[in-house]
Every structure is written in C-alpha cells, then in structure tokens.
Design a protein with these regions (language model features):
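N-terminal binding-site loop/beta-alpha segment at the start of enzyme catalytic domains
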Residues: 2-113, 166, 172, 266, ...
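Conserved, mostly hydrophobic/aromatic
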Residues: 45, 57, 90, 116, ...
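Acidic (Asp/Glu)-rich catalytic clusters
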Residues: 47-49, 103-111, 134-141, 193-196, ...
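Alpha-helical scaffolding within the catalytic cores
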Residues: 36-43, 99-100, 127-134, 186-187, ...
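Beta/alpha (TIM)-barrel catalytic core signal, keyed to glycine-rich beta->alpha loops juxtaposed to Asp/Glu
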Residues: 150-298
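Active-site mouth loops of central-metabolism enzymes
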Residues: 60-72, 117-125, 254-256
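Short, acidic/polar
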Residues: 69-82, 125-137, 185-190, 259-266
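Active-site groove signature of glycoside hydrolases
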Residues: 138-154
Length: 298
C-alpha cells in the first residue's frame, strides 16, 4: 500500500490551511513577533509571583517632602495620572510625609491591579500594630510588599529578628504578601542577600554611583563604586529574589538630561532588576521616565 497518497479530504484541508496563511500573513507575522517591552509592562517580582509595573512611582523623595509640597489634591492627581499611564506600582514608607495621603490617592482604583510597597523603620514595640496601621491608612486588606527600612549594618538580621518574625506572622495572616529589606550600605546589602528570610530587595543603583551603597556601616550618601553592588545583584538574582532598583536619578541630583538617560539605559540593561522606582513631582517627569524607558527597551 502506498502510504504517501492523500485522500481528497486531506488535500482540501491542507489547501485551505495554506490559503488561510496567504490571506492573513499579518496575523501569522504578529504571532511570531515578540511584543515590545515598555515601562508599563506587568513584570514578575522574583519568585514571589507578584506582578507590578516595570516602573514604579516613589512617594518618598527627600522623605516625601518633594511630593508633600504638591499638596494632597495635586498629589492625588499625579498618582491618578501615573496610573492612567500604566504605572501600578506605588512605593511608600511609614516615615514618609506622604504616608497619610496614599490611601486617598488610590481610592477607587481597582485594588487587584495595584502593587503597593511600604517600609517600616526602627524597631516598633508592637510591629504587628504598625503593619496593621498601613492597612488602615491605605484602606486595603493587604500590602503587597513590606520592607524593613534603611538597614546599614552587616549583622542587622540579629537585632531585627523580632521584627522579621513579626513580618512572617503578618504574611501568615495575609496582611502582607511579600517581605524584604531596603539597604543603605554594602555590609547591610550583603547581609540581606545572605539571609534566606529576604524575598524582596530594594537596592540603590545607577552607573554614576551616586548615593549608592558603600563599605561604611552608615547611610552612604556619597558616590561609591558600582561593581560591588552589581555583584550583589547577580547573587540575588541567582537566589530568585525580587529586586527593585532605586536612586535611578541620583536622589534627584541628575539635573542634566544626559545623566538621566545614561542611568535609565543602564538600569534597563540589567537583567537582575525586575523593576525600578523613581520619585516624581510632575506629569512631565513621569512622561520623560516612561519615554526614556520605552526607548531603552526598544
């Protein structure tokens, strides 16, 4: 028997399929062409599985003074504008002057589409009450990511064990969905990377080294070498951690457009970074950041 002979039905089916491809080449091309990456993409935060926009809105420039100076109404408007541009990640902290405002700013937005990250500094006596306060202020059942704020010592995990345990309890209660730490020195950054407790890292990074982590166990606010931080980022990524870059525009000191362009292109070239966060005070700044990120990813 000749098994290579086609039946009339097979011939017609294959002819129809070939004709469909000829009639709709655009559809075939679209399916094979990867989508362009943008600032508004919903990316995955490490192994947490949580989704957030690639670009986040930071509400804590100079401890939130920059955003607070806008006034509540203009702050609300700016948050809504960012959301309309596809930014769904909003970053806050209990110590920011904008902390009492964020709940009103996001009121009415679909909670399931937002990623809210906040931070708690120091060692509150009742850390669960402090975490619950975030839920009340933000008018939400949960905070997507809660960080221990501004660590500077290598062995911070020892004196902060009580705080870490409370974060674990809050996660079990579903008050928070992920936990982590923001660091302001290389020793603290190494300690965070070495700790299996850490799920999310908020890391200062830009190619100029401005306000990046250095070896001093203090809040480093000078220019420091970039390479040691990049080494830590690679190790974090190897562990499946969620990694977010901050100080993208040098704590607001990159006044020249070429410096901002260089920094954003650098960040977008780093596969270790899931997302970045920038503090904004105007629609023009949001538009510029989105434009530069989109161009860098093109």
């Amino acid at each position: 028997m000749n098994t290579n002979r086609y039946t009339r039905r097979q011939f017609l089916e294959r002819s129809a399929a070939a004709g469909a491809l000829l009639l709709a080449p655009g559809r075939f091309l679209a399916a094979s062409t990867p989508a362009k990456r943008t600032a508004a993409d919903q990316v995955t935060l490490g192994k947490t599985g949580l989704k957030l926009s690639r670009l986040g809105f930071g509400t804590g420039s100079n401890s939130g003074q920059v955003q607070h100076d806008l006034g509540q109404e203009q702050f609300n408007s700016l948050i809504r504008y960012a959301y309309d541009q596809g930014i769904t990640y909003f970053d806050c902290a209990q110590s920011y002057q904008t902390f009492p405002w964020l709940g009103a700013a996001i009121k009415g937005l679909p909670r399931e589409k937002l990623f809210i990250q906040s931070k708690i500094g120091g060692q509150p006596e009742d850390i669960l009450t402090a975490i619950d306060r975030h839920r009340k202020v933000f008018n939400t059942d949960y905070v997507d990511s809660m960080l221990i704020h501004c660590m500077v010592r290598n062995n911070w995990t020892d004196p902060w064990k009580r705080i870490m345990d409370a974060f674990d309890e809050a996660k079990e209660k579903k008050w928070i969905r992920a936990k982590g730490v923001s660091c302001h020195s290389l020793p603290a950054l190494r300690g965070a990377r070495q700790s299996d407790w850490t799920e999310v890292h908020l890391v200062r990074v830009n190619p100029q080294g401005a306000f990046m982590d250095g070896e001093n166990e203090a809040i480093n606010m000078t220019t420091n070498p970039v390479a040691p931080v990049l080494d830590e980022l690679k190790s974090m990524r190897a562990k499946g951690r969620g990694v977010i870059g901050m100080k993208m525009v040098g704590n607001g000191t990159f006044l020249q457009a070429e410096d901002r362009e260089k920094a954003i292109r650098f960040a977008m070239s780093r596969p270790e970074l899931d997302a970045v966060v920038i503090g904004f005070k105007s629609r023009a700044e949001i538009d510029e950041a989105i434009g530069r990120i989109n161009a860098a990813l093109a």
